[in-house]
Amino acid sequence: MTILRPQPQPTPAAAARPPLPRVDPITRLPILILFPHSHCNCRCLMCDIWRATTRAELAAADVARWLAEWQQLGVRRVVLSGGEALMHSHLWDLCAHLRGAGIGITLLSTGLLLTRHAAQVVAYCDDVIVSLDGPRAIHNEIRNIPRAYEKLALGVAAVKAAAPAVTVSGRCTVQRANYRHLREVVHAAH
């Protein structure tokens, strides 16, 4: 049996709308997300990057060679991701090439190495986005690293002490282990 339902009639305003413009192919790439390697210092429940066995890293010289092409594509910001970008053996050389080309840098980080690298982070990075997956106990459980929350808090404090104007924000992977604690995640971020 076929059931016919009345179809809504277009309103005069909707009927008079011009067609959408043709979309040209992507010719600009204002933000580039770069994975300089696949190492991580956490053992997160929801991620397997830490299981990677490759020791390969993106060389700073490669970035220097690619800069002209990136500038032609309109790259204005590079987001350093990973794993943990701060584990890259020549990260600051890589960042120096980006900075020299006038490209902004956002660092995504677990936060565990921010205390050690705070001076370089504020010298090279425009902003930092840390992973915060819950209040203390939940974050430590998800990250599977003892005192991960405490190390993150100390790292954020070190960055803010080195340069109060540097923006540090957080991101959270919502999952079974933390979805009931989202208000606490927001509270922990303050």
Predicted feature locations:
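Conserved strand-turn element in the central/C-terminal portion of the radical SAM core barrel
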Residues: 155-181, 185
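Conserved radical SAM core fold
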Residues: 41, 85-87, 111-118, 131-146, ...
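Alpha-helix N-cap and loop-to-helix initiation/capping positions
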Residues: 58, 62, 143-151
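Helix C-cap/helix->beta junction micro-motif
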Residues: 101, 124, 162-166
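Structural recognition of alpha->loop->beta junctions
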Residues: 119-135, 186-190
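Anion (oxyanion) recognition and catalysis
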Residues: 99, 160, 190
